[in-house]
């Protein structure tokens, strides 16, 4: 009888942890991206500033060369490295989705 109770308790605990992880994942990803940007830029640039800078680079490349090498390189990197279940893979898939939606 006790082993059944422990199994049920463990299942409930695991279910609670998974529910917490699922609801907090979006917040975790946002904070992870903010931390990486602040670490790389030494708190001198924000996320919207980096997005505007990337938009400018893509626009200049498209005007000069009729295609964007930076955009193609970033999309290819996300495609090549976005296959998996870790946070890194999920972030790469989210970036890839945003790039395809915005530029293609």
From Swiss-Prot:
InterPro entries in the cross-refs: AcMNPV_Orf4
Pfam family, one: DUF1477
Stated name of the protein: Uncharacterized 11.6 kDa protein
């Amino acid at each position: 009888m006790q082993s059944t109770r422990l199994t049920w308790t463990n299942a409930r605990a695991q279910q609670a942890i998974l529910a917490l992880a699922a609801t907090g994942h979006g917040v975790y990803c946002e904070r992870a991206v903010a931390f990486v940007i602040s670490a790389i830029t030494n708190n001198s640039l924000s996320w919207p500033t980096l997005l505007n800078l990337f938009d400018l680079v893509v626009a200049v490349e498209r005007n000069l060369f009729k295609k964007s090498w930076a955009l193609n390189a970033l999309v290819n990197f996300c495609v090549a490295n976005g296959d998996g279940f870790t946070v890194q893979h999920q972030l790469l898939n989210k970036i890839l989705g945003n790039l395809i939606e915005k530029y293609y």
